Design a protein with these regions (language model features):
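Metallocarboxypeptidase
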Residues: 1-119
Length: 119
């Protein structure tokens, strides 16, 4: 799993900064996935709903079929700390650049709260 250079870099970066939570951004769905299989880290659900209140996105558990080998899944399992996949935007990928300002506006609160949790 850590054979790709980008995977190795993300792994090493995560180990070096020891975050209290991680965010993995994807583009499709306006949903926040917060759980990995039966791993339910402390505060994971509560923070997910705070993110949802800030962004207007919905909160869902990661679907079983897609809940393998992702960054947040690895982090939750290895660290027992909250991890989130945040799906931004709706429409056909790649999303048009014209969507950026709205996506940024809806996600700024998530980024600020995540930074506060980390410190």
């Amino acid at each position: 799993p850590l054979t790709a250079p980008e995977s190795r870099a993300l792994y090493e970066f995560t180990r070096s900064v020891n975050p209290e939570l991680v965010l993995a951004y994807h583009t499709q769905g306006e949903v926040i996935y917060w759980k990995y299989l039966n791993f339910d880290p402390p505060e994971g659900r509560r923070i997910a709903y705070q993110f949802a209140a800030l962004s207007g996105y919905t909160v869902e558990e990661t679907p079983y079929a897609s809940g393998f080998a992702g960054y947040k899944d690895w982090f939750i399992q290895e660290e027992n700390k909250p991890g989130y996949t945040i799906e931004v935007g709706l429409g056909e990928n790649p999303l048009p650049i014209s969507e950026f300002d709205e996506i940024y506006r809806r996600n700024l609160g998530i980024l600020l709260l995540a930074a506060r949790v980390h410190t």
